[in-house]
Amino acid sequence: MADLKVNFAGIPMKNPVASASGTFGFGFEYQSVISPHELGALVVKGLTLSPKRGNQGTRLHETASGLLNSIGLENPGIDNFINEILPDLRQCDATTLINISGGNDEEYVEITQKLNNCQGIAGLEVNISCPNIREGGLVYGVDPELTYRLVSKVRQSTSFPVIVKLSPNVTDITEIAKACERAGADGLSLINTVAGMAIDIDQKEPVFDNISAGLSGPAIKPIALKAVYQVSQAVDLPVMGMGGIYNYQDAIEFILAGATSVALGTVNFAEPTAAKSIIQGIDNYLEREGYLSVNDIRGLAWK
């Protein structure tokens, strides 16, 4: 058996496979088929300062090779999570990353400070695909200066490892990655969903009330793979790669492209036990190819 352990942003992981935020709930929903303890890391669904009910109308829409979602960050809020969910989550003995979102810098900082004294947390994943209400709705993750300012404030507010989740909806994702590095981020996760939409030809109107939705699944894998390939060479930060991973071969591609770890998202809906087969598949691949550790193949596809 090969050594599957990795160190991602100072966080020891027993294997390189994590759950992607928003697709695995808080882990409890999948316990009948897979324990969060079996994952390299559990990344919980995104949390905001106050509870959110999410978007009205259609939330999910299948495409030919993926899934469009417009959930609207439905979540119980950070206080309810800390008081009611985290105590039970600790019992899972999982390496847990907390995904956080906010409408302005202060909200991100306040959420971070509320988590600082909590036990059972391995790190924070900062979702910068949120619109900044004080910057006319401009999404943090498309502007290097906004990204730098926000990540700097979060970094200064906690001793937890800070991982920043990057949006693909930018001209040059490496510029955003470099801003995160300058701000003191410990690691990066990429990519978030790709902006898209669908139209109901019978109603002759957009499927989603918000018009735009996030595309995930196999359709975005080539986009995600290229982003990981570019970013992992542009900065000296570990990368958690995600976007369309459905089998161990996909996961291996991301690691060869430079990812230290990978995260599974949409596949969890189609095949809840996918993580088990992907972890085993990575192990089998390493043995077959003669590698002692998964770390030995990281970035081998670089040219």
UniProtKB/Swiss-Prot annotation:
GO molecular function annotations of the record: dihydroorotate dehydrogenase (NAD+) activity
Pfam families tied to this protein: DHO_dh (PF01180)
InterPro entries given in the database record: Aldolase_TIM, DHO_dehydrogenase, DHOD_1B, Dihydroorotate_DH_1, Dihydroorotate_DH_1_2, Dihydroorotate_DH_cat, Dihydroorotate_DH_CS, Dihydroorotate_DH_I
Annotated cofactor note: Binds 1 FMN per subunit.
Catalysed reactions listed for this entry: (S)-dihydroorotate + NAD(+) = orotate + NADH + H(+)
GO biological process: 'de novo' pyrimidine nucleobase biosynthetic process; 'de novo' UMP biosynthetic process
Identification of the protein by name: Dihydroorotate dehydrogenase B (NAD(+)), catalytic subunit
Compartments where found: Cytoplasm
Similarity annotation: Belongs to the dihydroorotate dehydrogenase family. Type 1 subfamily.
Binding positions for FMN per the UniProt entry: 21, 45-46, 99, 127, 165, 191, 217, 243-244, 265-266
